[in-house]
A protein has these predicted regions:
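Short, solvent-exposed amphipathic alpha-helical segments in soluble enzyme
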Residues: 1, 25-29, 125-131, 170, ...
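Internal gly/pro-rich beta-alpha loop/helix module
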Residues: 1-102
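Structural motif
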Residues: 13-17, 113-117, 293-296
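Phosphate-binding active sites in nucleotide-utilizing proteins
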Residues: 106-171, 176-180
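Cysteine-nucleophile active-site neighborhood
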Residues: 160-237
C-alpha cells in the first residue's frame, strides 16, 4: 500500500453472502478504508471475452438493457450517496492540443478503416487529425468498397481481422482499391491493420485467406505479445527518423512468417521491451509505415506533423483528380 495515495473508498465485486461481506467490512474497517458497496456474483455483470480480452462494445447484445440491469444492481448494493460525489469529474483543464497550433493549410482528408474488423483507435488521434486539418473519413474494408476518393492518406488501425479473414478475402473491391492506393498515397498501418497488407491471413480456425499482397508475409496464430516497447528507427521513414526513439504498445496473438530477403532494407526499427529480446520489426517504405506497434500520435505531435507533410507532398506530385 502506498501511503501517499488517498483511497476514498472501495467497491468489491463477486461477494457471495452476508458473511462474506461482513468479513470484508471488518478488514477494511481496521485499515480505515470506507466500503462503498459489494456487488454480487451474477451473470448480469458478465461480459464476453476472446483471445485478446473483452469482446468489443459493438458486439454486445442490447447494451441499453445491460446498463439498466447494472443500474438496478448498483441501486441495490452500492452506497450511491457516498459514491456519486466521489465520481464527479474535476474541472476541465486546457485542451491537450493547446500547445499545437491548428493547421492553416488546405484540408487533407484521411481515410480511416473503421468497421467490425478494424476499430482499435485512440480517440485523441482522430481529434488531433481534425485539429491539424486532416478530417478522418471512415472506410469499411468489410463492405467491399473503394477507399473514399477524397482521401489523401490512409490509416489502418488494429482490430480483429483474423475473425473476419474470410469476408475480407472476398471483398475484392476493397483489396484492389487498397493496392492501388498504396502505390500513390501515404499509408499508416498498425497491428491488425498491417495484417490486411500481407499475402495471407489465417483465421481463428487456422484456415488461410488471401489478403492485399502488398507486403511479403503470411500471418498465423502465435504466442501472446503484450507490453510497452522502445523503438529505434533504422533509417528515415514516412513518420520516423534514424536516431530518434519512440514508445508504443504491442498487443496481439498472431505472428508473421516473413518472406523478405535479408538485404531487403525495409525494416522499420529495432524493438525492445521488458523481457523482450531486441529484434527488427515493421516495414519502412517511402509512403508506408507498417508495424505491430500501436503509437499514440497525440503523445508525439511530430508524427502528425510529418504525416500532414507527407500527405501534402504526395498530393502535389499526383495528377489532378487522383
Amino acid at each position: 500500500h502506498d501511503p501517499t495515495l488517498n483511497v476514498a473508498g472501495v467497491v468489491i465485486n463477486r461477494v457471495n453472502s452476508a458473511r462474506h461481506r461482513a468479513l470484508l467490512q471488518d478488514v477494511l474497517d481496521r485499515l480505515g478504508v470506507p466500503l462503498l458497496g459489494c456487488m454480487p456474483r451474477t451473470d448480469a455483470l458478465q461480459l464476453p471475452s476472446r483471445h485478446l480480452g473483452l469482446a468489443p462494445a459493438h458486439e454486445l447484445d442490447d447494451p441499453a438493457q445491460r446498463r439498466h440491469a447494472w443500474a438496478d444492481l448498483a441501486e441495490q448494493h452500492l452506497d450511491l450517496s457516498s459514491l456519486v460525489p466521489l465520481m464527479q469529474a474535476p474541472t476541465a483543464g486546457p485542451s491537450v492540443f493547446a500547445h499545437i497550433p491548428p493547421s492553416r493549410g488546405p484540408s487533407l482528408p484521411v481515410a480511416v478503416a473503421a468497421d467490425a474488423a478494424f476499430h482499435f483507435r485512440y480517440p485523441e488521434t482522430g481529434e488531433l487529425l481534425e485539429h491539424l486539418g486532416m478530417p478522418p473519413v471512415p472506410w469499411s474494408p468489410l463492405s467491399n468498397e473503394a477507399i473514399p476518393q477524397e482521401a489523401k492518406g490512409l490509416i489502418l488501425p488494429g482490430g480483429f481481422p483474423e475473425q473476419h479473414a474470410d469476408q475480407i478475402s472476398q471483398a475484392t473491391e476493397s483489396l484492389i482499391s487498397l493496392r492501388q492506393f498504396c502505390q500513390q498515397r501515404p499509408v499508416y498501418a498498425e497491428c491488425g491493420g498491417m495484417l490486411l497488407l500481407g499475402r495471407q491471413l489465417s483465421d481463428l480456425d487456422g484456415h488461410a485467406h488471401p489478403m492485399a499482397n502488398i507486403l511479403p508475409f503470411a500471418a498465423r496464430r502465435g504466442r501472446l505479445q503484450v507490453g510497452y516497447r522502445l523503438l529505434k528507427p533504422r533509417k528515415d521513414g514516412l513518420l520516423v527518423r534514424k536516431g530518434e526513439q519512440f514508445n508504443g504498445h504491442e498487443f496481439h496473438r498472431w505472428e508473421l512468417v516473413d518472406h523478405r530477403g535479408a538485404d531487403d532494407g525495409s525494416v522499420l526499427w529495432e524493438i525492445d521491451g521488458w523481457r523482450v529480446s531486441q529484434r527488427p520489426e515493421g516495414w519502412n517504405k517511402r509512403t508506408l509505415h507498417a508495424s505491430w506497434v500501436h503509437l499514440h500520435w497525440a503523445s508525439c505531435s511530430t508524427i502528425c506533423f510529418r504525416w500532414r507533410a507527407a500527405l501534402a507532398t504526395e498530393a502535389r506530385s499526383l495528377p489532378s483528380g487522383l
